[in-house]
């Protein structure tokens, strides 16, 4: 969402907004590099677990980063929500209805910005999300209408919610092994899975040939 915001603002004539977004995104790239060793391609999650355990002090570092972002988000809100130029270029611009969004196959924050409370993390209840307390964030310019401003607000609100989800997950993180002892080889077949991504639904398709290496 920070990358989206940083790329979006220069299109509205707010050039410094790009620098603010990239500055704050960098904090999270640094944080994610700690357990994974990578800055953009993390390869941290593996079949059966994760590459390595979180190092001591990681939760405290994550909390400091999130507290900084919370302060910065309030600055963003003061800067953009109250900007006449920003509002002129986003209010009632690029409008579509909730029914349009559904019919067009729009997913993720652009769907929820039309007031549709659909989030795969709850709808499909995968991974540890059933153990976390959250509901889909929604916004809309008016009843069931999305515009450029509501899509901006949707992402701001989702960043606040994401930090709450991360805090819950870190607090509930169990002790113990980070990889399963053995991973059973699956029979030949195929599987399809969808997950919630920052841009909407992410789709995965896997074909197995009966070995421990997927065919595709």
Question: What is each stretch, according to the model?
Answer:
Residues 1-216:
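Active-site bordering "gate/hinge" segments
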């Amino acid at each position: 969402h920070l990358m989206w915001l940083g790329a979006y603002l220069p299109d509205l004539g707010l050039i410094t907004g790009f620098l603010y977004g990239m500055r704050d995104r960098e904090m999270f790239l640094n944080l994610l590099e700690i357990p994974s060793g990578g800055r953009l391609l993390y390869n941290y999650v593996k079949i059966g677990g994760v590459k390595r355990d979180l190092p001591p002090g990681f939760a405290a570092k994550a909390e400091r980063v999130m507290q900084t972002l919370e302060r910065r988000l309030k600055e963003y809100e003061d800067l953009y929500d109250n900007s006449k130029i920003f509002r002129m270029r986003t209010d009632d611009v690029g409008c579509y209805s909730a029914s349009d969004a559904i019919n067009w196959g729009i997913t993720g924050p652009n769907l929820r910005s039309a007031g549709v409370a659909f989030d795969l993390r709850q709808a499909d209840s995968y991974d540890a999300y059933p153990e976390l307390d959250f509901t889909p964030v929604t916004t809309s310019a008016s009843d069931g209408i999305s515009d450029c401003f509501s899509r901006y607000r949707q992402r701001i609100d989702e960043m606040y919610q994401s930090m709450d989800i991360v805090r819950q997950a870190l607090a509930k993180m169990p002790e113990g092994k980070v990889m399963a002892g053995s991973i059973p080889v699956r029979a030949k077949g195929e599987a399809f899975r969808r997950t919630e991504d920052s841009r909407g639904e992410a789709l995965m398709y896997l074909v197995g040939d009966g070995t421990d290496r997927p065919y595709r």
